[in-house]
Structure formats: structure tokens, C-alpha cells
Amino acid sequence: MLWFKNLLIYRLNREIPLVAQEMESQLSAMAFTPCGSQDMSRTGWVPPLGGGSDALTHCANGQILLCARKEEKILPAPVLKQALQAKIERLEGEQHRKLKKTEKDALKDEVLHSLLPRAFSRFNQTWLWIDSVNNLIMLDAASAKRAEDVLALLRKSLGSLPVVPLTLDKPIEMTLTEWVRSGNTPAGFCLQDEAELKAILEEGGVIRCKQQALVCDEIAVHIEAGKLVTKLALDWHERIQLVLADDGAIKRLKFSETLRDQNEDIDREDAALRFDADFALMTGELAVLIDELITALGGETAQ
């Protein structure tokens, strides 16, 4: 199983039935199919277990895992430009006149479609985890754009998906700044050696610290000058390390070897059983982490 590296968290703002068995037929209508000869991109659902199963959902203890795959055709701009220029020059030579802009635009589309069947494809996969117990949806996505694209696919598949980004009662950067300023963190959380500080005013600059003790005079001076901590590396119970950003995004998740080794007694040859155990272990840990982190940051904004 691919352990999550990032977490973008969304709140279901009203209850809707999210049951794996019922979702199967809804998701199958949007199952992934490869790009046709004239498609620039395609996105759809694939089995989380890969070739080991045809099921588009994987469920354990009220947690549902989905996987979206996207195929994009890669057409380097210089290749398109060169082919277009060659066609323009040939036509202008044959017709003994300069082509109009509208004609060149039409030619560009024509050249694009002629090149598409020969273009290489780039694939990416995005994992989506539905915590039906706590009414949360988490995505292993490094950008909000990718997360929103996958949520849009899920919304289209289900017909409705009332979700909003998780919002907290207090600005995250204010809380992170206080943790670094005082050196005091809530129980279970420890400061690591990496942070980013930004000035409130845009022209005030950005400070990025790596492999540096954060509770020190140097950092204190920046905070006193008005900079706020916008990214902070944390350790949680010596089980998970992460970088928390001021928009609530959790990046660079790293699970301890002690945690990951808890399922080593399960035979790796039984891929489905190991996948199920790792998924249950990962989501169980992350659900507690998310709950404790929300509390540590001052709680959610009332819906």
C-alpha cells in the first residue's frame, strides 16, 4: 500500500450516505479509461488494490479508500511550434500570401490534433480517504488544485458532495508562531528543526530554516519584528512527522519504522490482507492525529 505523503482535509458539512457497496455502481460510471487518439486528458476511478481486485472502493472500520487516475498527453511547446511554423510556411509559399491570424489559429488546432496520437502520456494517481465516522474527506494531494479536481470527479460520480475545506477558529499561523516563540507545544507534539516565517507585509520577506533549533534568539528576533510562522515541522508522539502549513495543509508525512512495522507479521505474499491491515493502521493513526491537531490549533469554526 502507498502510505499517504500529504493530507488536504475537507469537512462534509451535511450528512450524506457514503456506503462503499452503494458507491461501487456510482463510481463505475466514471471508471478510468485511457485517452483516445484525440483526447488531451482523461480522469477516472481505478481499484485501490490495483490488479488484485476490480472493486473501486476499499473499506475498513468505516473508512473508505478511493483512487483517481489521470492521463495527460504531453506535447512539448517547441514541437507544436515547429510543426505549426512548417505548415504555415508551406501554405504561405503555395498561396503566395501571408496567412491571417484566424487562419493560423485554425491551423494550430489542426496541427495539435495531428500530433496527439503520437504524443506520450503522463499518468498520476491521487488517493482519497473518506472517514465516514468523523465526516471528513482527506486527499493525498500536494496541491489544492489536484484535490479539487478529484473532489469534482467524486461529486460528479455521486451527484452531490457537500464538502468545504477544514477551517479553524483561530488563524493557524498565530498558533504556530506562539508555539515557536514560547517553545511550548501541546501534549504529543514536538517542534522539529524546520520552519518558514513570513512578514505580515508582502515586502517584508520570507525566512526558511532547516536543520536549526527554532527556539533561539535568532528566530525570536524575526518574530518580534512581525514575522509569522507559516510552515512548521512537527513530531507527533514519535510516530508521525509532518510539516503543517498555515492553510491547514499537511505535507511530507513520515510514519515511524515502529509504526510501519506493526504489520510485519502479515505475509507480504497475501497482498490484499497486508493492504487491508496497512490501510486500517494508517487511517487509525491519522484519524487520531487529525483530531488532536484540530484541538491543539483551537478547534474548528462552527458550521
From Swiss-Prot:
Q: Give GO MF terms, alphabetically.
A: double-stranded DNA binding
Which parts of the chain span the membrane according to its record? none
**GO CC, one annotated term:** cytoplasm
InterPro entries associated with the record: RdgC (IPR007476)
Q: Where in the cell is it found?
A: Cytoplasm, Nucleoid
**What keyword terms does UniProt attach to this protein?**
Cytoplasm, DNA recombination
Matching entries from Pfam families are given as: RdgC (PF04381)
Q: Does the keyword Transmembrane apply?
A: no
Domain of life, per UniProt, equals: Bacteria
Q: What is its main location?
A: cytoplasm
Query: Per the UniProt entry, what are the Gene Ontology biological process annotations, in alphabetical order?
Result: DNA recombination; regulation of DNA recombination
Q: What does this protein do?
A: May be involved in recombination.
Family, according to the entry, reads as follows: Belongs to the RdgC family.
Report the protein name in the record: Recombination-associated protein RdgC
Organism of this sequence: Edwardsiella ictaluri (strain 93-146)
Gene encoding this polypeptide?
A: rdgC
